[in-house]
Amino acid sequence: MHYRFLRDSFVGRVTYHLSKHKYFAHPEEAKNYIIPEKYLADYKPTLADDTSINFEKEEIDNQGEPNSSQSSSSNNTIVDNNNNNNNDVDGDKIVVTWDGDDDPENPQNWPTLQKAFFIFQISFLTTSVYMGSAVYTPGIEELMHDFGIGRVVATLPLTLFVIGYGVGPLVFSPMSENAIFGRTSIYIITLFLFVILQIPTALVNNIAGLCILRFLGGFFASPCLATGGASVADVVKFWNLPVGLAAWSLGAVCGPSFGPFFGSILTVKASWRWTFWFMCIISGFSFVMLCFTLPETFGKTLLYRKAKRLRAITGNDRITSEGEIENSKMTSHELIIDTLWRPLEITVMEPVVLLINIYIAMVYSILYLFFEVFPIYFVGVKHFTLVELGTTYMSIVIGIVIAAFIYIPVIRQKFTKPILRQEQVFPEVFIPIAIVGGILLTSGLFIFGWSANRTTHWVGPLFGAATTASGAFLIFQTLFNFMGASFKPHYIASVFASNDLFRSVIASVFPLFGAPLFDNLATPEYPVAWGSSVLGFITLVMIAIPVLFYLNGPKLRARSKYAN
């Protein structure tokens, strides 16, 4: 691990301040550091200095790389938000920049191994909290007995957890894009609260308290889901961003399947309460590790801190940063508009966003519905034990991993290499893969439903579930990247915040009616066939959405006031 990771970690920052800058000092605080002339108090700008800074600039340069962005969670965007090569002088202010294009303090200049380790940390963080969504579901029967409640009420803690991490990005995403807060402090503080919340969740003795605690748990679990993609974008070059996002999102997509796997073992060996003690342990381990090893990567925050250090060293109050200037121009009214109103406005007014939100919400909901459907067949028909049921969820993980190994080389061929050759690439380059994903999703649902009967082997439904998961992964990756490439950087955060909220609210209610849907359509020979077919026919119709984007994408973007 590089020294920089410890220095810029949460513990490193605290130690730096408590020691009054004695430990974990930065390069500009070294005695042999040569202060650039422009930061000196008696420096006078010349005509050689460009004295204007345009923070509203949204064009993409001739390299195909954008100059800034705002990102959200599950915010899979292909817009680079870390290019801070703005001009150095703004009137009487001196704006701090990186020390050259190859400045090692710029996260985008880190060596590949450091970037890989950072992405691993974000992915592990995402997995360690995201598995908490469905971790208790194998113990629902025991929960129903302990609290004297029905199945629908026992499913509410899952519903409220999902709603919680849909609401969270409305609060935490704007904070993570503010230079004062940055990414790491948000991750660490909310993760600490998530860990603490697992203790009363494991001890609570009534369903009302459990529901409240689960909502709060989802709320504080949301930053890594909402901002993880933005953190990846901080360190990965624009042309490699889809690959970096795919690597991170493996943790995001596989996490909910790991939950029931571990939850089934813990429920059998102990009780449903131990699923939350497990979450406390695994997220607590993540908290301790990240406190020491997760560095800050948001460019505006790093330059904001650098500006403070340079002001202290030089005594020059003219030194400032882009983030400080933006904060001085942002009113509370504008903050409320950006945070609360604009995501709703874009969802309603933008057909592209609305259609993608509906499609992704449906796909997301189907994955959560599996937590209700698997027990109907594997326990009710094939008489699997609870632990054996938990292992069936690994079929979803296998399907996602296979899809990732196919997706990454394809996207490098279709996106990364053309960008490096300085060829023009349009957002619609992602859509053919989304169409393939839609076909796999629909096919998997029919395979799962009609192979899950009383006479066939149980491997058939698992193959169908893996196929469904493969399609879902491809749809997530491509449509998120399509949105990230289609909209102006200023609106990216709102676009993804709307998607977070929309898909989470829709997905949260699916488990409530999932079991009744399949029970009412079941036949003695085919217990889940017609329920799966209903979902299959819906997703078959929805394949028309990416087809529409492929055929009319440029026209739709041309009509939008938010799109590039």
Curated annotation (Swiss-Prot):
Biased amino acid composition, Low complexity: 67-88
GO BP of this protein: response to antibiotic; xenobiotic detoxification by transmembrane export across the plasma membrane
PROSITE patterns in the cross-refs: MFS
Top-level taxon in the UniProt lineage: Eukaryota
Transport recorded as keyword: yes
Family per record: Belongs to the major facilitator superfamily. CAR1 family.
Protein name: Benomyl/methotrexate resistance protein
Gene name tied to this protein: MDR1
